[in-house]
A protein has these predicted regions:
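Local sequence-structure signature of Cys/Sec-based thiol-disulfide redox active-site neighborhoods
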Residues: 8-41
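Short acidic-hydrophobic, aromatic-tinged amphipathic segments that line or gate anion-handling sites
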Residues: 1-9
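Structural micro-motif
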Residues: 65-74
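Thiol-based oxidoreductase modules, predominantly thioredoxin-like and allied folds used
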Residues: 4, 23, 39-42, 46-60
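Chalcogenol-based redox active-site neighborhoods
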Residues: 33-37, 56, 64-65, 91, ...
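Non-catalytic, surface beta->alpha helical segment in thiol-disulfide oxidoreductase systems
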Residues: 75-103
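Structural signal for short hydrophobic segments within the conserved structured cores
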Residues: 2, 51, 82-85
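Acidic phosphotransfer microenvironment of two-component signaling modules
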Residues: 8-11, 59, 92
């Protein structure tokens, strides 16, 4: 999973047809297993790029994208947010979204 280093990099990458971002902090104990589960989950969708953003490193991301808790997983399609899951992540909802995009 590639790590985003700047808000501009995020803006550029979010323009893809579909992309996934996970916002987390370096001290978040919940973020580690959720990130691992997301990576395993996304192995079924290798064509969809996945990125991680550490809020300490990209402060602007938290404010501009209204990230109030971590972990937060956000799906973007051509620069528009289409799904957001925070804290209690519903992987079934994410799978339904990806099935729609696959068809």
């Amino acid at each position: 999973m590639q790590t985003i280093q700047s808000y501009q990099e995020f803006l550029d990458l979010s323009q893809a047809p579909l992309s996934v971002f996970i916002a987390k902090t370096k001290m978040c104990s919940v973020c580690v297993p959720i990130s691992a589960k997301l990576e395993t989950f996304m192995k079924d969708y290798p064509e969809i790029p996945m990125y991680q953003i550490y809020l300490e490193d990209v402060l602007e991301f938290q404010g501009q994208q209204l990230i109030f808790t971590v972990p937060t997983i956000v799906f973007f399609s051509e620069g528009k947010e289409i799904l957001r899951e925070s804290r209690f992540i519903d992987f079934d909802k994410m799978e339904r979204l990806l099935e729609i995009y696959q068809s």
